[in-house]
């Protein structure tokens, strides 16, 4: 079968998932005809993605979250105003996505959490089915429980996630924990998409904890902690 990937260009996770899924599809005799990647003024394509992906890559203007002053989280008010001003560009991007779905001859579209994919299917109704992939779709699973946090922010997170999956045929929620299929929300939990290079690495014991920070502002917090606790290796 012929697949078209549409990838949200923010962060590294969606890129590695796309690379891994392409490898799996190619091994099983399928074809990825093209990869569309959302871009903005703050996003650049990482080198490992260009080196690893085999299908042609094309880019389109996509919504972007603007950070707070401390660069630890998204500034929702600022992001909403910014993206509202960019709405004409996003409409052109949706026309472009719809065009690429038709012209590539794709039989299935795979969406890696890109908002404009859901909006394109809601507005243009392409005949090609599409499947959403990402751990974020666990947020919509009927058995998933959020911690006691800001209910408004959690509602907005779920709302955004639903918008990325409008008119989708299925949502593949990446999860280390097995959960039953949620037929009402068309959600199937599957294991995380991990690259072969990672699984081939030989683990070694070390006196450290490896962490991942979504926003660079958290690095200041780590450095401040280390300054107060120099006995903890950094």
Q: Where are the predicted features?
A:
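A short, Lys/Arg-enriched amphipathic alpha-helix followed by its capping loop at the start of a domain
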Residues: 21-30, 224-229
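A short, glycine/small-residue-rich beta-strand->loop->alpha-helix junction that serves as a flexible
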Residues: 7-19
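An aromatic- and histidine-rich active-site surface loop
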Residues: 44, 109-124
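Active-site-proximal region of nucleotide-activated glycan assembly enzymes
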Residues: 124, 128-189
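Active-site donor-nucleotide binding/catalytic segment of nucleotide-sugar enzymes
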Residues: 174-178, 186-234
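Extreme N-terminal starter segment of soluble prokaryotic enzymes
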Residues: 1-4
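Conserved nucleotide-sugar donor-binding subdomain of glycosyltransferases
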Residues: 71-108, 115-116
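Conserved nucleotide-sugar phosphate-binding/catalytic loop shared by glycosyltransferases and other
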Residues: 9, 27-86
